[in-house]
Amino acid sequence: MRCEKLDVWKRSARLSVEVYKAFANCKDFGFKDQITRSSLSVPSNIAEGMEKDSKKEQSRFLEIAKGSSAELITQIYIAIEISYIEKQIGLSWKKEIEEILKMLVGLQQKINSESEH
């Protein structure tokens, strides 16, 4: 399945764009690098996984995307606490990434059930 057809890919790519824009002028290059890499990793791993022939490989890349989502939640919390982003924006991103995580779990379960048949 092409990743561009998946809502989870679309939403995670959109969130990554928002993160990149929000941190474009951030002078803390270490933090900026980490949070943008995490946000980019989610849609990138979804895309890479969906191009794999094996259901096991597809599931593995979705697992990596889930891990990157968890990293991003942590970095969002820290960004709020150190005033790199407004609380409202951070909480909106956190809510979105939690929805993305639910979608990843659902997609992974679907793929895993297909591989059992």
Short names for language-model regions:
Residues 1-117:
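Amphipathic alpha-helical assembly/interaction segments
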